Protein backbone atom coordinates (compact mmCIF):
# COMPACT_ATOMS: atom_id res chain seq x y z
CA UNK A 1 0.00 0.00 0.00
CA UNK A 2 1.06 3.61 -0.48
CA UNK A 3 1.05 6.15 2.33
CA UNK A 4 -2.46 7.52 1.73
CA UNK A 5 -3.84 3.97 1.72
CA UNK A 6 -1.92 3.28 4.93
CA UNK A 7 -3.58 6.26 6.63
CA UNK A 8 -6.98 4.99 5.54
CA UNK A 9 -6.09 1.62 7.07
CA UNK A 10 -4.83 2.88 10.45
CA UNK A 11 -7.30 5.78 10.66
CA UNK A 12 -6.74 9.24 9.25
CA UNK A 13 -7.58 11.04 12.48
CA UNK A 14 -7.79 8.48 15.25
CA UNK A 15 -7.20 8.84 18.98
CA UNK A 16 -3.42 8.84 18.60
CA UNK A 17 -3.43 11.58 15.97
CA UNK A 18 -5.92 13.62 17.96
CA UNK A 19 -3.53 13.63 20.92
CA UNK A 20 -0.60 14.65 18.72
CA UNK A 21 -2.67 17.37 17.06
CA UNK A 22 -3.95 18.70 20.39
CA UNK A 23 -0.40 18.95 21.71
CA UNK A 24 1.04 20.73 18.68
CA UNK A 25 -1.90 23.12 18.34
CA UNK A 26 -1.67 24.07 22.03
CA UNK A 27 1.99 24.88 21.36
CA UNK A 28 0.66 27.82 19.34
CA UNK A 29 -0.31 29.58 22.58
CA UNK A 30 3.40 29.69 23.46
CA UNK A 31 4.29 30.78 19.91
CA UNK A 32 1.71 33.58 20.06
CA UNK A 33 2.99 34.86 23.42
CA UNK A 34 6.52 35.10 22.03
CA UNK A 35 5.33 36.70 18.80
CA UNK A 36 3.23 39.35 20.54
CA UNK A 37 5.62 39.97 23.45
CA UNK A 38 6.74 43.44 22.32
CA UNK A 39 3.14 44.73 22.22
CA UNK A 40 2.98 44.85 26.04
CA UNK A 41 6.65 44.64 26.96
CA UNK A 42 7.33 47.60 24.67
CA UNK A 43 4.19 49.58 25.56
CA UNK A 44 4.75 53.30 26.06
CA UNK A 45 3.41 54.39 29.47
CA UNK A 46 1.97 57.81 30.11
CA UNK A 47 4.63 60.10 31.53
CA UNK A 48 5.23 63.70 32.50
CA UNK A 49 8.38 65.78 32.12
CA UNK A 50 8.32 68.55 34.72
CA UNK A 51 10.75 70.71 32.78
CA UNK A 52 10.32 70.75 29.02
CA UNK A 53 13.23 73.17 28.58
CA UNK A 54 15.91 70.69 29.65
CA UNK A 55 18.52 69.40 27.21
CA UNK A 56 17.62 66.39 25.11
CA UNK A 57 20.15 64.08 26.76
CA UNK A 58 18.85 60.81 28.22
CA UNK A 59 20.38 61.53 31.62
CA UNK A 60 18.58 64.86 31.96
CA UNK A 61 15.23 63.40 30.89
CA UNK A 62 15.63 60.68 33.52
CA UNK A 63 15.91 63.26 36.30
CA UNK A 64 12.69 65.06 35.30
CA UNK A 65 10.62 62.06 34.13
CA UNK A 66 7.54 60.92 36.10
CA UNK A 67 5.75 57.68 35.14
CA UNK A 68 1.97 57.83 35.71
CA UNK A 69 1.12 54.18 34.88
CA UNK A 70 0.84 51.04 36.99
CA UNK A 71 2.89 48.84 34.65
CA UNK A 72 6.51 48.66 33.58
CA UNK A 73 8.01 48.13 30.14
CA UNK A 74 11.36 48.43 28.42
CA UNK A 75 10.35 52.03 27.71
CA UNK A 76 10.04 52.88 31.40
CA UNK A 77 13.12 50.89 32.47
CA UNK A 78 15.52 52.19 29.83
CA UNK A 79 13.72 55.50 29.19
CA UNK A 80 13.13 54.86 25.50
CA UNK A 81 11.40 58.17 24.79
CA UNK A 82 12.10 61.18 22.63
CA UNK A 83 15.30 60.48 20.69
CA UNK A 84 15.42 56.91 22.02
CA UNK A 85 11.83 55.99 21.09
CA UNK A 86 12.85 54.36 17.80
CA UNK A 87 14.51 51.52 19.73
CA UNK A 88 11.15 49.90 20.53
CA UNK A 89 10.32 49.59 16.83
CA UNK A 90 13.89 48.49 16.15
CA UNK A 91 13.52 45.57 18.57
CA UNK A 92 10.26 44.63 16.85
CA UNK A 93 11.92 44.82 13.42
CA UNK A 94 14.77 42.62 14.64
CA UNK A 95 12.25 39.99 15.74
CA UNK A 96 10.63 40.01 12.28
CA UNK A 97 14.06 39.85 10.66
CA UNK A 98 14.71 36.78 12.80
CA UNK A 99 11.44 35.24 11.62
CA UNK A 100 12.58 35.82 8.06
CA UNK A 101 15.89 34.03 8.62
CA UNK A 102 14.24 31.22 10.59
CA UNK A 103 11.80 30.54 7.77
CA UNK A 104 14.67 30.37 5.28
CA UNK A 105 16.87 28.08 7.40
CA UNK A 106 14.46 25.70 9.11
CA UNK A 107 12.44 24.68 6.06
CA UNK A 108 15.29 23.12 4.05
CA UNK A 109 16.94 21.78 7.22
CA UNK A 110 13.84 19.87 8.27
CA UNK A 111 13.40 18.53 4.73
CA UNK A 112 16.97 17.21 4.85
CA UNK A 113 17.49 16.18 8.50
CA UNK A 114 13.94 15.35 9.53
CA UNK A 115 11.07 17.26 11.14
CA UNK A 116 11.57 16.06 14.72
CA UNK A 117 15.25 16.92 15.40
CA UNK A 118 14.97 20.36 13.78
CA UNK A 119 11.76 21.10 15.69
CA UNK A 120 13.28 20.04 19.03
CA UNK A 121 16.44 22.09 18.45
CA UNK A 122 14.43 25.17 17.51
CA UNK A 123 12.16 24.90 20.56
CA UNK A 124 15.12 24.45 22.92
CA UNK A 125 16.90 27.57 21.69
CA UNK A 126 13.62 29.50 21.53
CA UNK A 127 13.18 28.89 25.27
CA UNK A 128 16.82 29.72 25.99
CA UNK A 129 16.76 33.06 24.18
CA UNK A 130 13.32 33.77 25.67
CA UNK A 131 14.85 33.73 29.14
CA UNK A 132 17.69 35.93 27.86
CA UNK A 133 14.99 38.43 26.91
CA UNK A 134 13.42 38.38 30.38
CA UNK A 135 16.79 38.74 32.14
CA UNK A 136 18.40 41.19 29.70
CA UNK A 137 20.64 43.65 31.63
CA UNK A 138 20.52 46.24 28.84
CA UNK A 139 18.50 47.23 25.81
CA UNK A 140 21.21 45.91 23.50
CA UNK A 141 21.02 42.41 25.00
CA UNK A 142 17.21 42.58 24.86
CA UNK A 143 17.22 43.51 21.16
CA UNK A 144 19.73 40.82 20.19
CA UNK A 145 17.82 38.18 22.16
CA UNK A 146 14.60 39.14 20.36
CA UNK A 147 16.38 38.65 17.04
CA UNK A 148 17.40 35.11 17.99
CA UNK A 149 13.95 34.38 19.46
CA UNK A 150 12.55 35.37 16.06
CA UNK A 151 14.83 32.93 14.25
CA UNK A 152 13.94 30.03 16.54
CA UNK A 153 10.26 30.88 17.00
CA UNK A 154 9.58 31.31 13.30
CA UNK A 155 11.49 28.20 12.25
CA UNK A 156 10.16 25.97 15.03
CA UNK A 157 6.56 27.07 14.44
CA UNK A 158 6.90 26.35 10.73
CA UNK A 159 8.15 22.80 11.34
CA UNK A 160 5.51 22.12 14.02
CA UNK A 161 2.79 23.18 11.56
CA UNK A 162 4.09 20.70 8.98
CA UNK A 163 4.25 17.96 11.63
CA UNK A 164 0.62 18.64 12.53
CA UNK A 165 -0.32 18.11 8.89
CA UNK A 166 1.83 15.04 8.27
CA UNK A 167 0.62 13.08 11.31
CA UNK A 168 -2.91 12.84 9.87
CA UNK A 169 -4.57 11.74 6.65
CA UNK A 170 -4.81 14.27 3.86
CA UNK A 171 -8.56 14.77 4.23
CA UNK A 172 -7.96 16.25 7.70
CA UNK A 173 -5.26 18.74 6.70
CA UNK A 174 -7.75 21.57 6.45
CA UNK A 175 -9.01 20.88 9.98
CA UNK A 176 -5.59 20.59 11.62
CA UNK A 177 -4.26 23.62 9.74
CA UNK A 178 -7.25 25.71 10.81
CA UNK A 179 -6.95 24.56 14.42
CA UNK A 180 -3.30 25.63 14.47
CA UNK A 181 -4.12 29.16 13.33
CA UNK A 182 -7.21 29.35 15.54
CA UNK A 183 -5.23 28.52 18.69
CA UNK A 184 -2.61 31.11 17.70
CA UNK A 185 -5.36 33.76 17.68
CA UNK A 186 -6.61 32.54 21.06
CA UNK A 187 -3.00 32.67 22.27
CA UNK A 188 -2.91 36.41 21.54
CA UNK A 189 -5.93 36.90 23.79
CA UNK A 190 -4.33 34.69 26.46
CA UNK A 191 -1.20 36.85 26.36
CA UNK A 192 -3.36 39.94 26.89
CA UNK A 193 -4.89 38.25 29.95
CA UNK A 194 -1.41 37.48 31.31
CA UNK A 195 -0.40 41.09 30.79
CA UNK A 196 -3.49 42.34 32.60
CA UNK A 197 -2.50 40.49 35.78
CA UNK A 198 1.30 40.73 35.45
CA UNK A 199 2.28 44.38 35.13
CA UNK A 200 6.06 43.99 35.49
CA UNK A 201 7.54 43.42 32.04
CA UNK A 202 10.35 41.11 33.18
CA UNK A 203 7.95 38.88 35.12
CA UNK A 204 5.57 38.86 32.15
CA UNK A 205 8.35 37.84 29.74
CA UNK A 206 9.51 35.13 32.17
CA UNK A 207 6.02 33.69 32.72
CA UNK A 208 5.14 33.83 29.00
CA UNK A 209 8.30 31.89 28.15
CA UNK A 210 8.07 29.23 30.88
CA UNK A 211 5.37 27.00 29.27
CA UNK A 212 7.96 26.28 26.60
CA UNK A 213 9.77 23.96 29.05
CA UNK A 214 6.61 21.86 29.44
CA UNK A 215 6.18 21.60 25.68
CA UNK A 216 9.87 20.82 25.14
CA UNK A 217 9.94 17.91 27.59
CA UNK A 218 6.76 16.36 26.20
CA UNK A 219 8.00 16.84 22.62
CA UNK A 220 10.46 13.98 23.09
CA UNK A 221 7.42 11.68 22.91
CA UNK A 222 6.59 12.88 19.39
CA UNK A 223 7.39 10.47 16.55
CA UNK A 224 9.10 11.49 13.33
CA UNK A 225 6.78 12.37 10.47
CA UNK A 226 5.84 9.15 8.63
CA UNK A 227 5.53 11.14 5.42
CA UNK A 228 9.10 12.45 5.76
CA UNK A 229 10.42 8.95 6.53
CA UNK A 230 8.56 7.44 3.58
CA UNK A 231 9.57 10.12 1.08
CA UNK A 232 13.25 9.77 2.07
CA UNK A 233 13.35 6.00 1.67
CA UNK A 234 13.08 5.03 5.36
CA UNK A 235 10.21 2.68 4.61
CA UNK A 236 10.76 0.37 7.60
CA UNK A 237 10.84 3.31 10.04
CA UNK A 238 7.70 4.79 8.45
CA UNK A 239 5.93 1.44 8.85
CA UNK A 240 6.94 1.39 12.52
CA UNK A 241 5.48 4.86 13.17
CA UNK A 242 2.27 3.99 11.34
CA UNK A 243 1.88 0.73 13.27
CA UNK A 244 2.31 2.61 16.56
CA UNK A 245 -0.38 5.04 15.46
CA UNK A 246 -2.62 2.14 14.48
CA UNK A 247 -2.26 0.61 17.96
CA UNK A 248 -3.05 4.00 19.50
CA UNK A 249 -6.11 4.22 17.28
CA UNK A 250 -7.37 0.84 18.47
CA UNK A 251 -6.60 -1.20 15.34
CA UNK A 252 -6.16 -4.85 16.36
CA UNK A 253 -2.96 -6.55 15.18
CA UNK A 254 -2.11 -3.92 12.58
CA UNK A 255 0.13 -4.91 9.70
CA UNK A 256 1.41 -1.97 7.65
CA UNK A 257 3.45 -2.82 4.57
CA UNK A 258 4.40 0.11 2.36
CA UNK A 259 5.54 -0.08 -1.23
CA UNK A 260 8.64 1.84 -2.25
CA UNK A 261 8.17 5.56 -2.76
CA UNK A 262 8.98 6.78 -6.31
CA UNK A 263 11.98 9.08 -6.38
CA UNK A 264 13.68 7.80 -3.22
CA UNK A 265 16.26 5.86 -5.18
CA UNK A 266 17.87 9.10 -6.33
CA UNK A 267 21.15 9.77 -4.57
CA UNK A 268 20.92 13.54 -4.82
CA UNK A 269 19.43 15.23 -1.79
CA UNK A 270 16.51 17.56 -2.28
CA UNK A 271 17.01 21.22 -1.48
CA UNK A 272 15.42 24.63 -1.84
CA UNK A 273 16.99 24.85 -5.32
CA UNK A 274 14.52 22.21 -6.52
CA UNK A 275 11.86 24.92 -6.29
CA UNK A 276 13.68 26.72 -9.13
CA UNK A 277 14.97 23.68 -11.01
CA UNK A 278 11.59 22.15 -11.86
CA UNK A 279 9.18 24.22 -13.94
CA UNK A 280 6.03 23.03 -12.19
CA UNK A 281 7.47 24.02 -8.80
CA UNK A 282 9.05 27.23 -10.07
CA UNK A 283 5.79 28.82 -11.19
CA UNK A 284 3.88 27.61 -8.15
CA UNK A 285 6.55 29.11 -5.90
CA UNK A 286 6.52 32.49 -7.69
CA UNK A 287 2.74 32.75 -7.41
CA UNK A 288 2.64 31.56 -3.81
CA UNK A 289 5.43 33.92 -2.72
CA UNK A 290 3.47 36.87 -4.08
CA UNK A 291 0.25 35.69 -2.43
CA UNK A 292 1.97 35.22 0.95
CA UNK A 293 3.65 38.62 0.60
CA UNK A 294 0.31 40.32 -0.09
CA UNK A 295 -1.44 38.48 2.74
CA UNK A 296 1.09 39.91 5.18
CA UNK A 297 1.10 43.37 3.56
CA UNK A 298 -2.69 43.73 3.68
CA UNK A 299 -2.96 42.14 7.15
CA UNK A 300 -0.59 44.62 8.77
CA UNK A 301 -1.70 47.43 6.49
CA UNK A 302 -5.30 47.19 7.67
CA UNK A 303 -4.16 46.97 11.27
CA UNK A 304 -1.90 50.02 11.05
CA UNK A 305 -3.91 52.30 8.77
CA UNK A 306 -7.65 51.79 9.17
CA UNK A 307 -8.06 53.66 12.45
CA UNK A 308 -6.44 53.22 15.82
CA UNK A 309 -8.38 51.29 18.43
CA UNK A 310 -8.93 53.43 21.49
CA UNK A 311 -9.42 52.33 25.06
CA UNK A 312 -7.85 49.76 27.34
CA UNK A 313 -4.47 48.45 26.12
CA UNK A 314 -5.09 44.85 27.23
CA UNK A 315 -8.60 44.73 25.79
CA UNK A 316 -7.29 45.98 22.46
CA UNK A 317 -4.63 43.28 22.34
CA UNK A 318 -7.28 40.65 23.11
CA UNK A 319 -9.57 42.00 20.37
CA UNK A 320 -6.62 41.92 17.98
CA UNK A 321 -6.57 38.15 18.39
CA UNK A 322 -10.24 37.34 18.93
CA UNK A 323 -11.42 39.17 15.80
CA UNK A 324 -9.60 36.48 13.82
CA UNK A 325 -11.49 33.57 15.44
CA UNK A 326 -14.57 33.68 13.13
CA UNK A 327 -12.23 33.48 10.13
CA UNK A 328 -11.45 29.82 10.78
CA UNK A 329 -14.95 28.28 10.64
CA UNK A 330 -15.55 30.41 7.53
CA UNK A 331 -12.37 29.02 6.03
CA UNK A 332 -13.28 25.41 6.86
CA UNK A 333 -16.72 25.85 5.32
CA UNK A 334 -15.59 27.31 2.01
CA UNK A 335 -12.51 25.19 1.30
CA UNK A 336 -14.45 21.93 1.55
CA UNK A 337 -17.22 22.97 -0.86
CA UNK A 338 -16.94 21.71 -4.44
CA UNK A 339 -17.99 25.12 -5.81
CA UNK A 340 -15.27 26.88 -3.84
CA UNK A 341 -12.34 24.72 -2.77
CA UNK A 342 -8.90 26.03 -1.85
CA UNK A 343 -8.30 28.08 -4.99
CA UNK A 344 -11.53 30.07 -5.15
CA UNK A 345 -11.62 30.54 -1.36
CA UNK A 346 -8.16 32.12 -1.48
CA UNK A 347 -9.20 34.39 -4.34
CA UNK A 348 -12.44 35.38 -2.61
CA UNK A 349 -10.97 36.21 0.79
CA UNK A 350 -8.09 38.20 -0.72
CA UNK A 351 -10.48 40.04 -3.01
CA UNK A 352 -12.75 40.95 -0.11
CA UNK A 353 -9.80 42.31 1.89
CA UNK A 354 -8.63 44.30 -1.13
CA UNK A 355 -12.05 45.82 -1.74
CA UNK A 356 -12.28 46.68 1.98
CA UNK A 357 -9.15 48.80 1.53
CA UNK A 358 -10.50 50.43 -1.64
CA UNK A 359 -13.86 51.13 0.00
CA UNK A 360 -12.12 53.04 2.81
CA UNK A 361 -11.39 55.79 0.27
CA UNK A 362 -15.12 56.53 -0.07
CA UNK A 363 -15.86 56.79 3.66
CA UNK A 364 -16.94 60.31 4.68
CA UNK A 365 -14.89 62.28 7.16
CA UNK A 366 -17.56 61.85 9.88
CA UNK A 367 -18.77 58.27 9.99
CA UNK A 368 -21.57 56.69 11.95
CA UNK A 369 -21.10 53.89 14.42
CA UNK A 370 -22.10 51.20 11.93
CA UNK A 371 -19.49 51.91 9.27
CA UNK A 372 -16.23 53.57 10.19
CA UNK A 373 -12.54 52.90 9.51
CA UNK A 374 -12.13 50.75 12.65
CA UNK A 375 -15.10 48.50 11.79
CA UNK A 376 -13.87 48.22 8.22
CA UNK A 377 -10.40 47.33 9.51
CA UNK A 378 -11.86 44.51 11.63
CA UNK A 379 -13.87 43.10 8.71
CA UNK A 380 -10.86 43.37 6.43
CA UNK A 381 -8.66 41.69 9.00
CA UNK A 382 -11.22 38.92 9.38
CA UNK A 383 -11.07 38.31 5.64
CA UNK A 384 -7.30 38.42 5.26
CA UNK A 385 -6.95 36.14 8.32
CA UNK A 386 -9.16 33.62 6.54
CA UNK A 387 -7.00 34.02 3.43
CA UNK A 388 -3.87 33.40 5.51
CA UNK A 389 -5.41 30.23 6.91
CA UNK A 390 -6.39 28.90 3.49
CA UNK A 391 -2.98 29.74 2.04
CA UNK A 392 -1.18 27.79 4.79
CA UNK A 393 -3.25 24.68 4.04
CA UNK A 394 -3.18 25.20 0.27
CA UNK A 395 0.61 25.63 0.16
CA UNK A 396 1.15 22.42 2.17
CA UNK A 397 -0.90 20.52 -0.39
CA UNK A 398 0.76 22.06 -3.46
CA UNK A 399 4.30 20.95 -2.54
CA UNK A 400 5.55 17.33 -2.51
CA UNK A 401 6.69 16.00 0.85
CA UNK A 402 10.40 16.06 -0.08
CA UNK A 403 10.37 19.87 -0.51
CA UNK A 404 7.28 20.83 1.49
CA UNK A 405 9.12 22.57 4.30
CA UNK A 406 11.48 24.27 1.85
CA UNK A 407 8.48 25.58 -0.07
CA UNK A 408 6.72 26.75 3.07
CA UNK A 409 9.95 28.38 4.25
CA UNK A 410 10.41 30.37 1.04
CA UNK A 411 6.76 31.46 1.08
CA UNK A 412 7.00 32.45 4.75
CA UNK A 413 10.11 34.46 3.87
CA UNK A 414 8.09 36.43 1.32
CA UNK A 415 5.42 36.86 4.00
CA UNK A 416 7.95 38.50 6.35
CA UNK A 417 8.95 40.97 3.64
CA UNK A 418 5.31 42.02 3.45
CA UNK A 419 5.20 42.56 7.20
CA UNK A 420 8.42 44.57 7.16
CA UNK A 421 7.33 46.80 4.27
CA UNK A 422 3.74 47.49 5.38
CA UNK A 423 4.65 50.26 7.88
CA UNK A 424 6.37 52.22 5.11
CA UNK A 425 3.34 52.31 2.79
CA UNK A 426 1.65 55.09 4.85
CA UNK A 427 4.40 57.50 3.74
CA UNK A 428 2.54 57.57 0.41
CA UNK A 429 0.01 59.82 2.15
CA UNK A 430 2.29 62.73 1.30
CA UNK A 431 1.27 62.21 -2.34
CA UNK A 432 -2.41 61.58 -1.66
CA UNK A 433 -4.26 60.59 1.55
CA UNK A 434 -5.88 57.67 -0.30
CA UNK A 435 -2.70 56.25 -1.81
CA UNK A 436 -1.88 53.73 0.97
CA UNK A 437 -5.33 52.16 0.78
CA UNK A 438 -5.17 52.08 -3.02
CA UNK A 439 -1.84 50.23 -2.77
CA UNK A 440 -3.21 47.71 -0.25
CA UNK A 441 -6.41 47.27 -2.22
CA UNK A 442 -4.73 46.68 -5.57
CA UNK A 443 -2.30 44.24 -3.95
CA UNK A 444 -5.12 42.20 -2.39
CA UNK A 445 -7.22 42.10 -5.55
CA UNK A 446 -4.25 41.23 -7.79
CA UNK A 447 -3.16 38.39 -5.48
CA UNK A 448 -6.71 37.06 -5.49
CA UNK A 449 -6.78 37.02 -9.29
CA UNK A 450 -3.34 35.38 -9.57
CA UNK A 451 -4.34 32.66 -7.10
CA UNK A 452 -6.82 31.42 -9.71
CA UNK A 453 -3.81 30.29 -11.81
CA UNK A 454 -2.91 27.66 -9.20
CA UNK A 455 -4.32 24.10 -9.43
CA UNK A 456 -7.09 23.01 -7.10
CA UNK A 457 -5.99 20.47 -4.46
CA UNK A 458 -9.31 19.57 -2.87
CA UNK A 459 -9.80 15.76 -2.81
CA UNK A 460 -6.55 15.20 -4.69
CA UNK A 461 -3.74 12.88 -3.52
CA UNK A 462 -0.67 14.34 -1.83
CA UNK A 463 2.51 14.12 -3.90
CA UNK A 464 5.35 12.49 -1.96
CA UNK A 465 8.10 13.14 -4.51
CA UNK A 466 8.68 15.63 -7.32
CA UNK A 467 8.32 12.76 -9.77
CA UNK A 468 4.73 12.31 -8.56
CA UNK A 469 3.76 15.71 -9.96
CA UNK A 470 4.96 14.65 -13.42
CA UNK A 471 3.58 11.10 -13.25
CA UNK A 472 0.64 10.34 -15.61
CA UNK A 473 -0.76 7.96 -12.97
CA UNK A 474 -0.79 10.74 -10.36
CA UNK A 475 -2.47 13.17 -12.76
CA UNK A 476 -5.06 10.54 -13.73
CA UNK A 477 -5.80 9.79 -10.06
CA UNK A 478 -6.17 13.52 -9.38
CA UNK A 479 -8.70 13.91 -12.18
CA UNK A 480 -10.54 10.79 -11.03
CA UNK A 481 -10.86 12.07 -7.47
CA UNK A 482 -12.06 15.43 -8.74
CA UNK A 483 -14.80 13.83 -10.86
CA UNK A 484 -15.80 11.54 -7.97
CA UNK A 485 -16.03 14.51 -5.58
CA UNK A 486 -18.27 16.46 -7.93
CA UNK A 487 -20.81 13.64 -8.26
Swiss-Prot record:
Residue intervals passing through the bilayer: 22-42, 90-110, 117-137, 141-161, 178-198, 203-223, 286-306, 315-335, 345-365, 374-394, 406-426, 435-455
Chief location of this protein within or outside the cell: membrane
Membrane topology, from the record: Multi-pass membrane protein
Region forming the signal peptide: none
Compartments in which it is found: Membrane
Keywords: Glycoprotein, Ion transport, Membrane, Transmembrane, Transmembrane helix, Transport
GO term, biological process aspect, one: monoatomic ion transport
Pfam families in alphabetical order: Sugar_tr
Entry-linked PROSITE patterns: MFS (PS50850)
InterPro entries listed in its UniProt record: MFS_dom, MFS_sugar_transport-like, MFS_trans_sf
Molecular functions per Gene Ontology: transmembrane transporter activity
Residues of this chain annotated as glycosylated in UniProt: 70
Domain of life: Eukaryota
A GO cellular component annotation in the UniProt record: membrane
PANTHER family from the UniProt entry: SOLUTE CARRIER FAMILY 22 MEMBER (PTHR24064)
Stated role: Probably transports organic cations.
Record-stated family: Belongs to the major facilitator (TC 2.A.1) superfamily. Organic cation transporter (TC 2.A.1.19) family.
Protein name stated in the entry: Solute carrier family 22 member 15-like
